[in-house]
Amino acid sequence: MRKTKSKEFIQKLVDIVGTKNALFGKQETSSFRTGIRIGFGSAIAVVLPRNLIELWEVIKICISQEKIVLMQAANTGLTGGSTPDGDSYDRDLVIINTRYLDKIQLLNKGSQVLAFPGATLYKLEELLEPLNREPHSVIGSSCIGASVVGGVCNNS
């Protein structure tokens, strides 16, 4: 990976999400770069947007600077898709962790849901239980915080 952390790029990320939600050091980004079960690699930054506008702004700046964007929800590491895979990328990689974007909205009396990027299967199960409904998948990883989006992306 190139690791070209320009001060301007870093400052733009901090301006969007604040210093608390823009992480750059190896130690402070370690848990985001390592899956619980599998996966490990490098990233020049980990960004934790707190709303969809911040998410959009972060993605815009990353794309404009030709960074690789790795969207991360629960980072369970069950499939390896939520962490970088080594250090051999041809460009800098930025992890965007969506754990703060965890809203779920029930639509049409619970017949449909709108799940934000960081929403968990556990939370979805809790919301649907009073309606005698179940989520698209009922799997063991619900209890460790697996995301709705991760479940859909991995066909579970």
Where are these regions (language model features)?
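Short, flexible, solvent-exposed loop/turn segments with mixed acidic/basic and small polar residues
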Residues: F32-I38, L101-L106
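FAD-binding glycine-rich core of flavoenzymes that anchor FAD
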Residues: L52-S156
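Glycine-centered flexibility motif
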Residues: G18-T19, F40-G41, G80-G81
